[in-house]
Amino acid sequence: MVQKVKTFLSKGNRAAWCLFLLFAISIFLKGVIFHWFCFHSVILSSLWHHPLEFIRFWGGKLIPALFLGGFVFLFRSKTWMIYAHVLIDIWLIANLFYYNANALFLSYETMKMADNMSGFWDSLYAYTEWSMLLYPIITLLFAVCLLCIPKVSKRLPIAFCVVMSLSLLLSIIDNLCFKVYTHSWHPQNKVTEQVNSRMLSGEEFTYYYPFGHVYYFAVVSKSIDYNAWAYSYVREYSVLSYFPACFVWSILRPAGEIIDLTEKDIEQVRPFIHGNIRQKTPTPQTNLVFVLFESLESWPIDEVCGYNFMPNLQAILRNKHSLYCNKLKSQVRHGNSADGQLIDITGLLPIANGATCRLYADNILPSYAQCYPYSAIINPAPGMWNQEKVTFGYQFKQLIEPQKGEHWADKELIDQMINYIDTVKEPFCLFGISVSSHVPFSQGSINPTYIIDGMPHIMLAYLNCLHYTDSVIGNLVNAVQCNERLANNTTIVISGDHTIFRGEDQEIDTFADIHDINMQTTHTYTPLIIYSPKKIKNNIYVTDTCYQMDIYPTIMDIIGCEEYFWKGVGVNVMDSAARNNRPILEKDAYDISDMIIRSNYFNLH
């Protein structure tokens, strides 16, 4: 049978055309499968409802398959196609991992941060899913099919030109259909409003050529940030064409450069600057101890299936000198934990593309640490998130961390924090970074304290990790409360760096629903817990939805530094009027923060 197929294909140019079809179809199939698992739709019914949408959608998936398939006519060897498939698999699987973890797609800047995974590669296990196996399976089947196809006898440059011209024509048609379709059926779409805000002419005519979509949003319109553009591009076109597109974006709108603000931009920033930025900083009225709790969400603080996983945090909440906000919306971007640190320390939100800690680590930013004569960050994982630079960019005086190549578990972290507060002079500011509850929650898998029948493994491991960290945080709280020098003069803040269950995990959601657990993986919050005997005299329980950007202004009020020139873009959560009457929307807070960081505003103005 195989020999008959080879004989048939050996005549004329049949082998080349068969290879082209096989290669192009396999690439096309991978792109469609990726789209399905990310967006859960393939828009088939639109063929008779909205034909332009159908052409736009499938055309975007077909273009990269045609483009790559065309090179079959230039190379006689078949080996390169296997390499191409393997590289495509790596790109697709890497994006699936990143999307499952962050609901974002890889960018050029995030690819440059791969070294940050050092010591945390096992976290990928938590985001592995069976669909990832489909891509290497298709590659394997393609390799088997190659055995049935004879070697191409000659190059076909004319066929190559025809296929390239077809892909270019399809690109123009697809872009045109995208514009016409969105204008006709989705005028309420924010991206569409910007696309159709003015007629395309002159330089904007490039919109109709490959990567014109990138050019328009990166250069002409600048109406949306990178993440919104990337999501739109992958959904409307293909994750395969997104690979070169993300590099094109980085060329058209490079990240990491210091930008110049227009007078209009400066007017937007000025309302958030109070007084002279060079003025003398106020003296804090209390010491400050902040624990950035890795991946802490709010729901585990309550009882789960009759078990109390976090008794020490609950004990803090029962104390009359505590504040608890249980609905704090995570606002991190590509920087993940580093973004959480940025928000909590400086009151600024992260930049749109890339991680602030990498691209703008040399910027000196305002923070409550500037107000303290003694301050330190304790980092349990050296080299993580460029901590050796941003610690001093956030105006802390000292960085404490283990030797390179070593990591501290949370018990060792808390021991270091206790040692610091026992020996440092006052007033002091200490910021500790927890890591033991990092995915894949191995701390809770190796030696679980609780075993609950039927609970999904990852959920149980997560809860046991939190229980471990809660137990050592109890040691820190006791160390403060039992120290006469610190007991009434120290504020303790505990909050999560970000939420962790961000995808649609049906198994976890079903278990939570059956057992009346107040959580959904698509709608989770991180908590804010503050213990301050000097400032808080009666329990404060905030049930309104708040934001991570509210942590900084709340702390500034509690430590008595309200007169500091920078109060952040959030509000004090203890002020109910401010919570319900915010000066700006979340989107505007992102934009203002982006301008401040990327212009190095506090050094230049």
What are the residue ranges of the model-derived segments?
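Transmembrane and membrane-interface helices of multi-pass
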Residues: 4-242
